[in-house]
Regions:
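Short Pro-Cys-Gly-centered "Cys-loop" motif that presents a nucleophilic cysteine in a tight turn
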Residues: 1-4, 8-9, 18-178
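Conserved active-site beta-strand element of glycosyltransferases/polysaccharide synthases
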Residues: 15
């Protein structure tokens, strides 16, 4: 059962309810089949997504909805869009815009029930996506370090663009940024 997803250019996030033993085989099959499809369609070869998959057991509902928020906000954090509903390769559109009517949806109806029990409306769940959350959702130390560096770089890139800074050396001399 798929609870949330977001497909980026070099990786994807997928929240699934699965038997742990079947998860590895499922992910191997998914990556392999998608690589064949993508490579045939675009005349490419090799892996489509970088690295192996990482999984984490979600035991608390509060952590689950925070992970969904993290997944949906991935393209916003990458500055691809300013709103989660503007990104076409995410379950956010299926959940919030009811795109299920237009095409066969892949989100489990179970997650919609869980969300309706936790939030009074989809608007409230949408607003929850805009609540700041600095949780990294990463369990592997090397990935946490890489994530921290990416967050710093992302912040600096945003700061440079926002303040129209042409020379990156200027930013390094700003005391409140260092």
């Amino acid at each position: 059962e798929i609870y949330a997803y977001c497909i980026m250019s070099n990786h994807f996030h997928l929240m699934v309810k699965s038997d742990f033993k079947m998860l590895s085989a499922f992910m191997r099959e998914l990556n392999s089949n998608y690589a064949v499809y993508y490579n045939c369609k675009y005349g490419e070869s090799g892996h489509v997504f970088q690295g192996r998959f990482y999984s984490s057991c979600i035991e608390k509902e509060s952590y689950m909805v925070s992970c969904i928020r993290y997944i949906h906000n991935n393209p916003v954090r990458a500055y691809l869009v300013s709103d989660i509903l503007s990104y076409p390769y995410s379950s956010a559109r299926e959940i919030f815009l009811n795109d299920r009517r237009k095409k066969r949806g892949c989100i489990s109806r179970d997650i919609l029930g869980i969300l309706s029990n936790r939030f009074t409306s989809l608007d409230q769940f949408y607003d929850f996506h805009n609540v700041f959350d600095n949780q990294g959702y990463i369990d592997i130390p090397e990935d946490k370090e890489r994530y921290d560096r990416e967050q710093i770089k992302s912040f600096l890139d945003h700061y440079i663009r926002k303040n129209n800074i042409k020379n990156e050396r200027i930013i390094l001399s700003a005391r409140h940024i260092r």
